[in-house]
Amino acid sequence: MAYEKSTDISDVSRSMFLYPWLEYPDKTKELRKAMAPVHLPLSCYQMPKEEFPPSPECWRQHPSKPNSVPYCYFKKPEIYTHWHDLYDQREEREAEKMLRKMRDDCRYIKEVHQTHIKMFHLPMSKLTIKSEMRSRPLEPTQDPLKWQRLRELTKSLESPREDEQFYAAQALGCLRISDKFVMEALQQVAQTGPEKVKYEAYRTLAILGCLNKHVIRALIKQLKEKNEGQRMETLTGLRMALNSWAAVSKDKRTQVGDEGKLVPVLQTLIKKSSSEASLEAALCLGFLRPCSNMVQEFLLQCLCQGLKTQRMKALRMLVKVMHVHSAPVIKAILDQLCSSSVLEDRFEATQMLKTIGLEQIQAQGLEELTFNLLRRKTHNEPFLAVRQAVAQTVEELKLKPTMMNLVEAQLMNPDATARQEAVISLGVLGIRSPQVFHLLLDLLDAENHQAVKKSLQETLILCASIDPWIQNKLKNKVLSVYEAPKTNVKAEPTRFQKEPENPEELTIQDFRLAKLNPLFIAKSITKVGQKKTPAFPPCCSKPRKHRPQVIGPWQPRIKKQLRVLAEIAK
């Protein structure tokens, strides 16, 4: 029997390069395999490592990064967000793709401009109010690192060290992954672990959606203890669990175990606990009993006392869950919009006004108060995103035509502050007619007040970023946003200002707006007390493009040049 020797792949490859004219089986396949690049797997040192739960630093956005959408006229960032308000990268890519299409095709702009495309400049996706993250199962192939972290934490629940068990139970609650093996491990340690670990395991089980009678009884026991800090943590975890539970439709909700025993305990805490614990207990009871008069009265009292953040919690429950749209609630919303120091709370107040609607506001006799406050917030709000949200609310409440009439009339006010407020308001309300646009251009040339001039330039730049008609009109106009020097020199009109002689003097402040070519955003870097060195000696004439226009008497200048020439001749 003949023995056929198998061909080694290395011999085939070697013969293929040495004798390419030879024919042998699978020559094409071997050639393709030999020419293909070799991708070696990453070593254990090159593999990216990630730890769950991650450090809080990785959730924070730095204002210098492009995703934070910095305000394009001030050094301070436009938006600071928390970890749950992170910008969706996919939405940003879709928006940029749509904007490129808009710039390339003017006809497409005219068709879509009246719809959602005009809102792409808004950075409000960072401020969108999202419900709390619900617990969910996790597939091993979906996120291998997180799956590995879950396995490690569940093993840590069996550790002989109490601190490791406590940390593992706490971390599993932060991850919000309700896989079967996680729930079983938590239930096991809740029955057999130390008292401290039992407390945290039951709290994590509630957060992950397990609200059976055993968990509720353990939570009731913790709520009855005298430790105020532990009671507050239990109430916070219970509120998070009930918030996720109430977000599910009624036909798909699971029954809360021993609900009849939990309700009296919460009612007692509302009456006898501290203000913060009483509020948390009222919020928990509000999810269980949305029609409770006791909870409604207590939350209405909270609107008039306590911190602004606590008042906002009460407002969310009253407006979104209990659907109470009374006059005190509307006034509390306006108070949050006017004086809250939290950016997200001011933004959410505008959304609450949309939810209530104009009819309810008119029925409570608060239409004039609401109109005046919204009009004020279109110019005195420091953050552009909130001003744009206010403008959207004005349009939703059908108050925009009246407000536009007042703002446009205010442009001719002799008071510079009033004119500046009107200009800033138009930046978010929009320019609705060519007459108003040309009026703004005339004001830009005739305005002597530097702050008003700067606001005019910013408004035109902002409107050009969303309106192709305005962008086309400003095509060959350079808008220089100048910092007013602290001198007594009278500011010159824009048309007589010298253009910067050096390209280094132009500072593009916002790269995204710089993409709106040929619209340029410039800022002169002229410091007080700093003299510029002339580009040409006094005896030489400047090129035509560098000559400034005549802005004053010219005879003294000629005499000065003749005097310099005479001194040089000596």
UniProtKB/Swiss-Prot annotation:
Gene3D superfamilies the record matches: Leucine-rich Repeat Variant
Superkingdom of source: Eukaryota
Biological processes, Gene Ontology terms: hematopoietic progenitor cell differentiation; response to cytokine; response to virus
PANTHER family (UniProt xref): PROTEIN HEATR9 (PTHR38323:SF1)
Protein name, as recorded: Protein HEATR9
Organism: Homo sapiens
Lineage: Eukaryota, Metazoa, Chordata, Craniata, Vertebrata
